[in-house]
Regions:
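Conserved AMP-binding/adenylate-forming core of the ANL superfamily
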Residues: 35-89, 106-111, 159
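Active-site-adjacent beta-strand anchor residues
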Residues: 13, 77, 123-126
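Aromatic/hydrophobic pocket-lining residues that form π-stacking "cages" and hydrophobic walls in ligand
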Residues: 23, 87, 133
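Flexible, non-catalytic linker and terminal segments flanking ANL/adenylate-forming cores
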Residues: 1-18
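Structural core segment of the AMP-binding/adenylate-forming
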Residues: 65-66, 93-159
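A short N-terminal helical cap/helix-turn-helix that marks the beginning
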Residues: 14-35
Length: 159
């Protein structure tokens, strides 16, 4: 690298105010074109830009209704799946901060991350991961809510 640094040519990059704004602008333009795919019972199924944008808006609205404000932190711990991207975009679209957490974390790891990040809500997939995140959240006083991506998830009873 030379002593003088050239300014990067930004003409080829998206220069929107933020990622969420760029997403919604693209969703309006690309509407019914496919965006996210996943395997369901051995078959690939997809969601188009409009469907994903609707899911992002609905989750963002639920977060706001739960009292989340800009700069609040939301933990996301889930496998690589369309709902992860939807949760990520929903959190960013309301100005909150995503706190990503590994699916391999122990309950104690999740407690540490929740306590030190100040996360108020956790979003997770289902099954054992949801149980582990729920147990961790039950140990963190400031945690308000747990949202699961899988609607039929059974969580531990905290009485």
């Amino acid at each position: 690298m030379s002593a003088t640094t050239k300014k990067a040519d930004m003409s080829r990059y998206v220069t929107k105010a933020n990622l969420a704004g760029a997403f919604f602008e693209n969703a309006a333009a690309l509407d019914k074109k496919p965006l996210l795919f996943h395997k369901n019972k051995g078959k690939w199924t997809g969601r188009n830009w409009d469907e994903v944008a609707d899911s992002v808006r609905r989750l963002a609205g639920a977060l706001v209704a739960a009292g989340i404000k800009p700069r609040d932190r939301i933990l996301i711990s889930a496998e690589n799946r369309p709902e992860w991207a939807i949760a990520d975009l929903a959190v960013m679209s309301i100005g909150a901060i995503v706190v990503p957490a590994y699916t391999t974390n122990t309950e104690d790891d999740h407690v540490y991350i929740m306590e030190h990040s100040g996360a108020l809500i956790a979003i997770t997939s289902g099954g054992l991961l949801a149980s582990r995140v729920a147990l961790a959240a039950s140990r963190v006083q400031h945690m308000r809510m747990l949202i699961t991506m899988d609607p039929d998830t059974e969580l531990p009873d905290f009485g």
